[in-house]
Amino acid sequence: MALVTVQRSPTPSTTSSPCASEADSGEEECRSQPRSISESFLTVKGAALFLPRGNGSSTPRVSHRRNKHAGDLQQHLQAMFILLRPEDNIRLAVRLESTYQNRTRYMVVVSTNGRQDTEESIVLGMDFSSNDSSTCTMGLVLPLWSDTLIHLDGDGGFSVSTDNRVHIFKPVSVQAMWSALQSLHKACEVARMHNYYPGSLFLTWVSYYESHINSDQSSVNEWNAMQDVQSHRPDSPALFTDIPTERERTERLIKTKLREIMMQKDLENITSKEIRTELEMQMVCNLREFKEFIDNEMIVILGQMDSPTQIFEHVFLGSEWNASNLEDLQNRGVRYILNVTREIDNFFPGVFEYHNIRVYDEEATDLLAYWNDTYKFISKAKKHGSKCLVHCKMGVSRSASTVIAYAMKEYGWNLDRAYDYVKERRTVTKPNPSFMRQLEEYQGILLASKQRHNKLWRSHSDSDLSDHHEPICKPGLELNKKEMTTSADQIAEVKTVENLAAMPTVFMEHVVPQDANQKGLHTKERVICLEFSSQEFRAGQIEDELNLNDINGCSSGCCLSESKLPLDNCHASKALLQPGQAPDIANKFPDLAVEDLETDALKADMNVHLLPMEELTSRLKDLPMSPDLESPSPQASCQAAISDFSTDRIDFFSALEKFVELSQETRSRSFSHSRIEELGGGRSEGCRLSVIEVAASEMAADDQRSSSLSNTPHASEESSVDEDQSKAITELVSPDIIMQSHSENAISVKEIVTEIESISQGVGQVQLKGDILSNPCHTPKKSTIHELPLERVPAPESKPGHWEQDESFCSVQPELARDSGKCAPEEGCLTTHSSTADLEEEEPVEGEHDWGPGMHSGAKWCPGSVRRATLEFEERLRQEQENHGTASAGPTLSNRKNSKNDSSVADLMPKWKSDETTPEHSFFLKEAEPSKGKGKCSGSEAGSLSHCERNPTMPDCELLEHHSLPAPQDCLGSDSRSKKQEGDLKKQRAVVPNQECDTQAILLPLPKKIEIIEYTPTVTSLGHTEPGGEATPSKEGEKQGLRKVKMEQSITMFCALDENLNRTLEPSQVSLHPQVLPLPHSSSECDRPADPNPMLSSPQDKGDCPSTPFKTAAPFVSCSTQGASFSLDYLLPHSVVHLEGCTEQSSATDNELSPEQASWEDSRGHFLSSGSGMAHTSSPLTNEDLSLINKLGDSVGVLQKKLDPSPEACRIPHSSSSENIRDLSHSRGVVKEHAKEIESRVIFQAGFSKTSQMKRSASLAKLGYLDLCKDYLPDRELVSSESPHLKLLQPFLRTDSGMHALMAHEPSESAGAQQNPQPTKYSVEQLKTSECIVQSKPVERPSVQYAKEFGYSQQCLLPKARPELTSSEGGLPLLQTQGLQYTGPSPGLAVAPRQQHGRTHPLRRLKRANDKKRTTNPFYNTM
């Protein structure tokens, strides 16, 4: 179709005035300048249709050039105008068939303004002697009276009868005939309306043309007789003689076939006779009897094709004819026209706003390149409240493809949904195969751009949206859009959590409802697992989540508002979220402060990966104790989660896959991580959830936790990301992992490779143990991983999830990204070994390594170069492994590890690096079977971290971050923190406990925690617990931003399992003595129950545990006050105090670090006071506090000896003692009361005033395990003092206990804060400092503050921490069954020694432990 302009001048014979208006109802412009008059026509092959000038405001363009698409029609129109009067105008010119080969004949409809200003029309027959003739003659004049009738003759033409005259016209094409019929019907309608009849005063000007008939006789005869021109179509061949017996059935078939033919054929080049012939060919029968029916149907179809189709309220899809129908366009409110053709011109340039896409409907056409422009044009029309017509020639291929592309981008639909939607409204829609391929490519581009957009969003805002989506495209995770949708749908079907948006990205394990998990796992279907990197939910995160959901055809808006998950992916996330968890998230989310949001933005993005159901199944299977999280039994859920911890991440993909995934994740994470570090709480606080292939029931538990996490909008988006990082979903990263991620940023790929190589030696064991550990640890691990920016690793392997996250932290920086890439693969292969190496290489990875015995030490070797630190860390890990049960190794490892743990804890808090704990678990498993207890500690730590993550201001996260950096620095950013860490780390390596100023003197054997401290020197005695039962969150202020988001992460870990995925405490052990529950490994942690600090210390424990040898079988002691379901525990900041690293070894490690620890902790305590900026922030531990801590450490040592067969386990740092344990026990009672008081206060207060300190202390890390919400922990003090025993229980209760512990911790902290003198105040750093932190024993107020801070963070994330605790109770029984049988007896003393070797040991020991862990992975035992 083309637009041609014809110049015309009045003929000399004309006597009409120059101003006489042309016949066209005033549509023609006045001929004030006759010589410059031009007319515009819409031309197709064989026809020209006059185009009115609209409002006449624009002068028609004057072009003397011939339109290449008009053929000779433009020339013929020019010749025809010579025969017309100046006042007359051509309405239509249609080329007709002729009996003479070289003769060209046109039926011309001419109109003019009549006597009463009405339009009068006649039909003229014009003859051209030859096709190229420039002159024409007139052979027919036929006035159109009111009695005019038009009939189709069935042979490609129509007859016009009027005043007893009948003339037959046979246009050269169907399109030309359609144009003629339209014009004739309009003219006849006007004639009937005004009753034009022969002899009246109308059409008197016909005589002028009748007197000018000048064609030769043969032409005149053709016009008059017409019989010989009819060119009847010959009869059909004898072949087609069978007439269908059922006429009705035949007509239906004719309708269908006819529409197909007319849609496929170029109607400009085919006649109705040819269409009927084609129809007969396809139907294999003679349709002569149906020719009338066929003609009528043809007209109906043409009419349908001629009217534009309304696809959306503001979008019409049509053909060139629709674009040429001015009246119809104006009636429909169209002001914008998108012309997707090269051959069709813009018909009304002065009336409509046009945008042209000059392309042909060909296979080679690249239409995709224009879709961004077309989207903007259509959006512009929508923005201005107008409507847009998108047209090509037929409205079938080019324009339809463009509208489909618009729908995909505007509404986030997938190709199938958009295509079906458009096809349903315009049945003729049929993009050519090339356009369909381009639409598929565009779908991928939109998906990738969403991910990039989200990443950018997260990197520039509080949200972790960016990484969430990017993982979807991770090579490691080969999930296409449909697969992702399917996974999400499966999860949604299995279990839908309605309040996904409400739930902050607290550590919520991926808990696909058990049914769903079992279904998906057993059916080997793909299940979505969420991997959350952020502690807080942000609009951006939600948006990202929604976007991912949109990928599945749901509008992002639908999920955004309520995370109801209208989208497929959203539903998946929802399914992952536990209904019980959802409310908690919702409650916490409202409490998120701007600070929290900022922190979240700084944190590593939340990652959600879809893990193939097969992988999930196997990993879940690996989780021995992971019951259906969906099941009502809280203990069952908790146990399942614990089991997940124990076996979490053992099942890795190939090292190569892991490496690839890590590399990708590292890149994405490096940006978010560095940004997070810069912002302060620079730790990548992304806790990444990895999907581990576990038994279906275990998977369900994990999914529940995951669901808890995904209950928040953040979870939702993570759910999508998790699809990419499906493997990492089940993994829980411990706070240490978060720290590791930060240091990891500085790690180089080379370092990672080196670590991988070192780890590869124990790969076999690690993988086996890793699977086992990763499954038990799975849930907590997930959270941690979730936080980690690194997502590709988690996707490939759930266990490596934390590990990967550590690497992803590395990837935060480009170089780190590469390094992490290396680490991730090796992590994927060897969770335990890799974790250790990563800790060494990448301090940020430390959290992940925390799971490993010495993994934490190397987490943050930022002091020097990442590589240097990594090497040193590996060395120390190896030493730690060697000195598995030696306390002397503890201090060195603790220092190194502490720094790393600190950073890991910080990372975990900010990044939900529960995964970190998982690597630790893996590591511990490697080190020894007894290390399973440590694994639990690690899990506990991860749980604590989860808690921190949950609460945007969770002290645990803050603590971790503070450990990584000074409180202020932590806030500043990961980079500054890393630098400080490097300096501090060097110092801390010697004195890891220093990170916990308050706990420094205590020097509890919590190497992992200590490492966290080392990681962030700024974090001072987070875990310090003083008799006052308070926690000093020196890091609270610093970590508030990051930690708030990261708190969520620590929730994941349950005390039932070590962070090494080992059950820290056996049921009998738990029952025996809450204080002893920590086992030698959790000596400090035992103190923790007395104070929310234990929770804070849980991360510290985690850090310590990794440092401590695996041999310590100290049960994983989390202070989980209430038995909530596993998933809830993850959802809520666990009150479980994971005395990770509180093993003999931990104690020994602490002892090593004791001198440094004291000084370091003192300094840290100051940091806590200043950094946390909390009311209850305590100055560095006083001598009294240190002594208290030491006593606790001794007590823990005794407990460890009793609980842990290994000498190292029995070994307790000088800071931990039975006396301390007893003190913790006693303070537990006091704290318990306080906890009750504070618990109520905490419930009503969303945020902790002392979040920073809590976060900064190891207690904060432990608090991460507490199910503390910002809402629940109005005061760190509340958390600390209220539930010391709850804290103890929490380690055992992954979900339930975690929740209760959180509640208990919140009140405990408040009470602790009030009771500044209470011993509950051992800080998490203290815990870290001493591997054996007695969680139940209050040491000092700082710890409470830390706990409060942790609780605050959690509250920020989980406004209803207490409700979450309650929800967690369902899962608690499971956890209790595993390791919390003792929870009831001494709720405050539940200690989850994470047995993270060398947590307090130097990096060297950590490295050694890491290596050991890799090799010792098989030793992981779930007690």
UniProtKB/Swiss-Prot annotation:
Residues 1-37, 51-70, 698-725, 833-858, 878-950, 967-991, 1021-1042, 1074-1105, 1207-1226 are annotated as: Disordered. This is Protein phosphatase Slingshot homolog 2. PROSITE patterns: DEK_C, TYR_PHOSPHATASE_1, TYR_PHOSPHATASE_2, TYR_PHOSPHATASE_DUAL. Residues 307-448 form the Tyrosine-protein phosphatase domain. Its main location: cytoplasm. It comes from Mus musculus. Interacts with filamentous actin. Protein phosphatase which regulates actin filament dynamics. Dephosphorylates and activates the actin binding/depolymerizing factor cofilin, which subsequently binds to actin filaments and stimulates their disassembly. Inhibitory phosphorylation of cofilin is mediated by LIMK1, which may also be dephosphorylated and inactivated by this protein. Required for spermatogenesis. Involved in acrosome biogenesis, probably by regulating cofilin-mediated actin cytoskeleton remodeling during proacrosomal vesicle fusion and/or Golgi to perinuclear vesicle trafficking. Expressed in brain, heart, liver, skeletal muscle, testis and thymus. Also expressed at lower levels in kidney, small intestine and spleen. Within testicular seminiferous tubules expressed in germ cells and spermatocytes, where it has a cytoplasmic localization, and round spermatids, where it concentrates in the acrosomal region next to the nucleus. Keywords: Actin-binding, Cell junction, Cytoplasm, Cytoplasmic vesicle, Cytoskeleton, Differentiation, Hydrolase, Phosphoprotein, Protein phosphatase, Spermatogenesis. Transmembrane segments: none annotated. Residues 248-303 form the DEK-C domain. SMART domains: DSPc. One of its GO terms (molecular function) is actin binding. Residues 884-904 have a biased composition (Polar residues). GO terms for cellular component: acrosomal vesicle; cytoskeleton; focal adhesion. The active site is at C392. The gene is Ssh2. Tyrosine phosphatase activity has not been demonstrated for this protein to date. Residues 9-18 have a biased composition (Low complexity). The modification Phosphothreonine is found at T1422. Its EC number is 3.1.3.16, 3.1.3.48.
